[in-house]
C-alpha cells in the first residue's frame, strides 16, 4: 500500500470516529431520561412553572401556584413547557432542553475546532468537553445553565468564525443575536461580547495577522449593528412583557417587572444576598474538581498557550483571553456558584485540544489522572463496604437520609476499580473516560431509581392519602419548596414563597378557621409550637428533604392564635395532571 492510500485510509477514519463520538455523547446525555422526576433544588421549580404555563395558558409571566416567579426570564421554562405539551410527561420534558442544548454545544465545539485546526483537534476538543465532569453534570440536570452555556457558545462560535475563519457579517450578527437570547434566558448571556477585548488587543499588537482587518472597511456601523441585533433579540420577550404589564394595571405584575429587570440583574451581581464566596473560590474550589480532566493538564497546557500567544496565534489568544475575563467577571461578584463558570468550559476544551496529544504522553500527567480515578474508585468501594458491614457513620447516614445505597456504591466502586486495573498498564489516561462512562451509566439508571423516593415528597402525599383518602380536600403549604406543589394530587393553597414563616402560619390559621371541612395544613413539625395549633393533634406524614412533615386538620386549631393577624395574599393551584 503506497503513502497516498495510507493517507486516504487515515483520513477516512475520522468520519467514523466523529459518528461514534456523537453516539457516545447521545447515550451519556440521554440515558436516564424518564427514570426520575425533577429533584431539588431548582428542577421542581422550573418544572412546576412550565407545567403551569401549559395548564393555564399564561406563558409570558412564569408563576408557581399563581405567584409570579421573577427570578429568571421565561425562555428555559418555555422549552420545558413545549416538551411537556408535546409528550404530556414532565419526567421526559424537564430534562430534554438541557440535553439537546448540550449536544448542540458539543457540535459547535467540534465544528469550530475543525475549522481552526483539523478533524483530529475537533475530536479531541469534543471528547474533552464531553468527558469533563461539570459539563455532563449540567447536561443531565434541568437547570438553566446548560442552555445559557449553549447560547454563549453560539456567540463565541460566531465571533471566532467571523474573526478567524471567514469574513461574513452574518456570523457576527448571529453571535449577537444569541447573546440576546442568552440574556432573556439568564442575564449573563451577553458574555461573548467580552471576546472583543482580546480581539482588539490582537489587532493592535499583531495587525499583520488580523484577517478581519484586511477584509473590513473602516466603517464602524456594521460593528455597532451587532448591539442592535442583540437588543432586537432581547425585545422579542422584553417589549411584549412591558406592554402587557403596562396594560394590566396589576401591581403584582409591576413588581414582577421591577424585580426581574433590576433586583435579579444589577443588584444580584453587585450586591448578592446569597452564595457569598471569596474572590478565589472558582480557582481553588471549583476548577480543580469540576473541570477534570483538563484541570490536571493545566500545568502542561499553560506553557503551550504562552508560546502560541507569543507567536500571535489568535486561535489561542481570543478564547483564552475571553476565559480569563469570564472568570474575572464572576469572581468580582460576591455571589458565586460553581455552575456559573460552565460557559467557559467549551472554549477551554477548544484551546486544549491542539496540545492534548502531547500532554497525555507525559507520564506524570497520565499517572496523575489514573491516580485520581484510583482514589475515587477506592472511595466508592470503601463507602459501599462500610455500609454492608454496618459501620457506625454509615448507619447514621442511612438514618439521616432514609436510604441504603451500599450495594450501589459497592458495585459501582468494584467496576471502576476494575477500570483502574485494566488501565494500569499502557495508556493510563484512558482510566478517566472509562471511569466517567461507568459512573454515569450506573448513576443515571440504578442511582436514579434509588434516589427517587428520597428526592421527592411522593411518600408524604402517599401517607396523606392514607389519612384523608382521595376525597375533595385542599392542602395549605407553609414554609415549603416547589416540589410540594408539583407532586401534590390535591388542590393546594399557599401564602407566598418569600412570606415570613410566622405570617404564613397566621394566614394558614385564618384560612383553616373559615370552615371545618376539607381543609388541611402541611407543615414542618418544628413550626407547630406557637400556640396556634395543638401539637398532639398533628398527624405525622413522614420525612422528606430532611424535614418531618405533619398534617393539621381543623381539630388541631387552638381557640386563639397568638400570632398577629395578617392580610397576606392567598395563592391557589389545582393540578390538572398530577406528577406520578
Task: Label each residue range with its predicted role.
Residues 2-6, 10, 16, 173, ...:
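Membrane-embedded architecture of ER/inner-membrane glycosylation machinery
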Residues 15-23, 109-131:
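Transmembrane-helix signature of polytopic, membrane-embedded enzymes
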Residues 27-32, 45-68, 75, 82:
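Extracytosolic helix-loop segments that constitute the early lumenal/periplasmic catalytic or substrate-binding loops
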Residues 46-49, 178-181, 190-337, 347, ...:
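Transmembrane-lumen/periplasm boundary regions of multi-pass, lipid-linked membrane glycan transferases
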Residues 95, 134-148:
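Short acidic/glycine- and proline-prone juxtamembrane loop motifs at membrane-interface regions
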Residues 96-116, 154:
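Transmembrane-helix motifs of polytopic, lipid-linked glycan transferases
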Residues 108, 148-165, 348-351:
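Specific aromatic-rich, kink-prone transmembrane helix
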Residues 115-116, 155-172, 182, 356-360:
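Membrane-interface transmembrane helices that cradle and orient dolichyl/undecaprenyl
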Amino acid at each position: 500500500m503506497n503513502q497516498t492510500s495510507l493517507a486516504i485510509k487515515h483520513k477516512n477514519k475520522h468520519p467514523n470516529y466523529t459518528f461514534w463520538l456523537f453516539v457516545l455523547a447521545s447515550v451519556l446525555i440521554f440515558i436516564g431520561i424518564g427514570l426520575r422526576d425533577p429533584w431539588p433544588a431548582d428542577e421542581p421549580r422550573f418544572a412546576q412553572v412550565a407545567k403551569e404555563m401549559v395548564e393555564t395558558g399564561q406563558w409570558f409571566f412564569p408563576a408557581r401556584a399563581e405567584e409570579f416567579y421573577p427570578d429568571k426570564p421565561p425562555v428555559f421554562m418555555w422549552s420545558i413547557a413545549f416538551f411537556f405539551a408535546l409528550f404530556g410527561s414532565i419526567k421526559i420534558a424537564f430534562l430534554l432542553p438541557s440535553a439537546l442544548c448540550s449536544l448542540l454545544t458539543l457540535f459547535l465545539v467540534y465544528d469550530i475546532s475543525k475549522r481552526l485546526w483539523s478533524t483530529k483537534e475537533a475530536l479531541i476538543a469534543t471528547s474533552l468537553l464531553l468527558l469533563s465532569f461539570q459539563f455532563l453534570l449540567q447536561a443531565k440536570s434541568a437547570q438553566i445553565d446548560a442552555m445559557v452555556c449553549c447560547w454563549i457558545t453560539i456567540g463565541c462560535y460566531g465571533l471566532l468564525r467571523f474573526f478567524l475563519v471567514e469574513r461574513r457579517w452574518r456570523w457576527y450578527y448571529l453571535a449577537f443575536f444569541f447573546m440576546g437570547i442568552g440574556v432573556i434566558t439568564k442575564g449573563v448571556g451577553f458574555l461573548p461580547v467580552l471576546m472583543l477585548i482580546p480581539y482588539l488587543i490582537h489587532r493592535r499588537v499583531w495587525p499583520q495577522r488580523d484577517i478581519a482587518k484586511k477584509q473590513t472597511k473602516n466603517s464602524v456601523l456594521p460593528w455597532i449593528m451587532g448591539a442592535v441585533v442583540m437588543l432586537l433579540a432581547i425585545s422579542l420577550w422584553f417589549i411584549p412583557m412591558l406592554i402587557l404589564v403596562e396594560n394590566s394595571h396589576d401591581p403584582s405584575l409591576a413588581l414582577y417587572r421591577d424585580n426581574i429587570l433590576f433586583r435579579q440583574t444589577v443588584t444580584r451581581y453587585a450586591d448578592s444576598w446569597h452564595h457569598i464566596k471569596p474572590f478565589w473560590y472558582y480557582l481553588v474550589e471549583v476548577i480543580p474538581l469540576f473541570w477534570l480532566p483538563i484541570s490536571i493538564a493545566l500545568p502542561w497546557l499553560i506553557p503551550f498557550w504562552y508560546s502560541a500567544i507569543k507567536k500571535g496565534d489568535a486561535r489561542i489568544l481570543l478564547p483564552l483571553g475571553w476565559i480569563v475575563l469570564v472568570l474575572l467577571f464572576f469572581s468580582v461578584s460576591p455571589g458565586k456558584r460553581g455552575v456559573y463558570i460552565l460557559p467557559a468550559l467549551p472554549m477551554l476544551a477548544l484551546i486544549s485540544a491542539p496540545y492534548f496529544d502531547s500532554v497525555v504522553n507525559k507520564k506524570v500527567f497520565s499517572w496523575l489522572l489514573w491516580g485520581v480515578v484510583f482514589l475515587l474508585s477506592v472511595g466508592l468501594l470503601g463507602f459501599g463496604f462500610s455500609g454492608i458491614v454496618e459501620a457506625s457513620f454509615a448507619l447514621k447516614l442511612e438514618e439521616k437520609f432514609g436510604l441504603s445505597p451500599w450495594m450501589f456504591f459497592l458495585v459501582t466502586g468494584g467496576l471502576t476499580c476494575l477500570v483502574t486495573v485494566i488501565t494500569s498498564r499502557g495508556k493510563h489516561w484512558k482510566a478517566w473516560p472509562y471511569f466517567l462512562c461507568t459512573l454515569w451509566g450506573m448513576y443515571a439508571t440504578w442511582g436514579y431509581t434509588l434516589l427517587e423516593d428520597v428526592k421527592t415528597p411522593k411518600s408524604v402525599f402517599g401517607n396523606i392519602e392514607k389519612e384523608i383518602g382521595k376525597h375533595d380536600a385542599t392542602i395549605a403549604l407553609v414554609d415549603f419548596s416547589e416540589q410540594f406543589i408539583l407532586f401534590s394530587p390535591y388542590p393546594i393553597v399557599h401564602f407566598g414563597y418569600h412570606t415570613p414563616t410566622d405570617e404564613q402560619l397566621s394566614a394558614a390559621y385564618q384560612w383553616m378557621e373559615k370552615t371545618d371541612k376539607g381543609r388541611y395544613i402541611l407543615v414542618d413539625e418544628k413550626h407547630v409550637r406557637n400556640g396556634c395549633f395543638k401539637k398532639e393533634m398533628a398527624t405525622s406524614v413522614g420525612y422528606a428533604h430532611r424535614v418531618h412533615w405533619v398534617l393539621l386538620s381543623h381539630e388541631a386549631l387552638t381557640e386563639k392564635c397568638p400570632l398577629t393577624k395578617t392580610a397576606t395574599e392567598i395563592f391557589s393551584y389545582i393540578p390538572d395532571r398530577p406528577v406520578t
